[in-house]
UniProtKB/Swiss-Prot annotation:
Cofactor(s) demanded: Fe cation
HAMAP family: LuxS
Stated name of the protein: S-ribosylhomocysteine lyase
Stated family: Belongs to the LuxS family.
Cofactor annotation remark: Binds 1 Fe cation per subunit.
Coiled-coil segments on the chain, per record: none
Subunit structure: Homodimer.
Reactions catalysed, as given in the entry: S-(5-deoxy-D-ribos-5-yl)-L-homocysteine = (S)-4,5-dihydroxypentane-2,3-dione + L-homocysteine
NCBIfam families in alphabetical order: PRK02260.2-5, PRK02260.3-1
First-level EC class: lyase
Organism ancestry: Bacteria, Bacillati, Bacillota, Bacilli, Lactobacillales
Gene: luxS
UniProt-listed SUPFAM superfamilies: LuxS/MPP-like metallohydrolase
Organism per entry: Streptococcus mutans serotype c (strain ATCC 700610 / UA159)
GO biological process entries: quorum sensing
Pfam families, sorted: LuxS
Length: 160
């Protein structure tokens, strides 16, 4: 017998949200009591735009490093299939304001100071699709997202 489940992200009204934003999706406790938080890092407005794969791939690799440099507890940051943002999975309790501040600082570094030598995991040995990267695209999208501002609320624009 198949268990009935509800996938939270499919219940979200993608028309009502106002990207870019950070949204707490869930807080769950593991079998030993450890808290895991799941955040929606929405960089572009759903159904209006999407980040091209090569740029998103490069942003993904950079966020894997830059987030860890700015906050403890990162488990994973994985892109949404719709290419509008990322799931950020963290150990412990974090606020959307904390996470939005970290994302903003990371995007500022991507936009302003990152060079190709700073992008981790771009060789055939270290990446499953190493030819599909674009630092130019990553930088342009980071600038556009920063120009719009990052909110710590998905429905009201409350910029960090």
């Amino acid at each position: 017998m198949t268990k009935e489940v509800t996938v939270e992200s499919f219940e979200l009204d993608h028309i009502a949200v106002k990207a870019p934003y950070v949204r707490l999706i869930s807080e769950e406790f593991g079998p030993k009591g450890d808290l895991i938080t799941n955040f929606d890092i929405r960089l572009v407005q759903p159904n209006e735009d999407s980040i091209p794969t090569a740029g998103l791939h490069t942003i993904e690799h950079l966020l894997a490093k830059l987030i860890r440099q700015r906050i403890d507890g990162m488990i994973d940051c994985s892109p949404f299939g719709c290419r509008t943002g990322f799931h950020l999975i963290m150990w412990g309790k974090h606020t959307t304001t904390q996470i939005a501040t970290v994302i903003k600082a990371s995007l500022e570094e991507i936009a302003n100071t990152i060079s190709w030598k700073d992008v981790p995991g771009t060789t055939i040995e270290s990446c499953g699709n190493y030819k599909d990267h674009s630092l130019f695209s990553a930088k342009e999208w980071a600038k556009l997202i920063l120009k719009q501002g990052i909110s710590d609320d998905p429905f009201e624009r409350h910029l960090v």
